[in-house]
């Protein structure tokens, strides 16, 4: 039996991170991008790097730069960074967690913050997944 607190090998951490990112986060990012486009915003989801970062970029049609929500791995610390950047005021908010932080509740909370604070919007799909009074 292995110690659950023992760190994973870097290779195993990166593999689990990539699998979790694609299985849990990517579909939620794609749905948020679709909702954003339906609300008249320009939105794009992309990955970059190794280990991959998943990024949702959103901008108003009049904006030349995008606000974003990015999930990235910190292999040295074996943690995940959830990063929100708001182009309107240049602020960044970062939430650190373990691999288990790549879940619908954390991602929905971050997406809700990005759209509420960055664009004054509520995403219908996020609102539908959570009961009234959740936020």
Predicted regions and their residues:
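Intrinsically disordered, low-complexity regulatory segments enriched in Ser/Thr/Pro
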Residues: 59-113
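Charge-rich, low-complexity N-terminal segments
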Residues: 1-32, 117, 125, 129, ...
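Intrinsically disordered, low-complexity regions
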Residues: 19, 50, 61, 91, ...
């Amino acid at each position: 039996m292995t110690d659950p607190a023992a760190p994973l090998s870097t290779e195993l951490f990166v593999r689990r991170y990539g699998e979790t990112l694609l299985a849990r986060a990517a579909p939620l990012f794609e749905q948020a991008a679709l909702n954003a486009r339906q609300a008249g915003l320009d939105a794009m989801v992309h990955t970059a790097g190794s280990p991959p970062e998943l990024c949702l970029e959103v901008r108003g049609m009049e904006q030349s730069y995008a606000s974003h929500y990015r999930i990235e791995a910190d292999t040295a610390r074996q943690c995940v960074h959830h990063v929100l950047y708001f182009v309107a005021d240049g602020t960044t908010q970062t939430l650190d967690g373990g691999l288990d932080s790549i879940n619908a509740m954390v991602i929905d909370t971050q997406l809700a913050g990005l759209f509420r604070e960055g664009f004054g919007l509520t995403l219908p799909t996020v609102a539908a997944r959570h009961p009234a009074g959740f936020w």
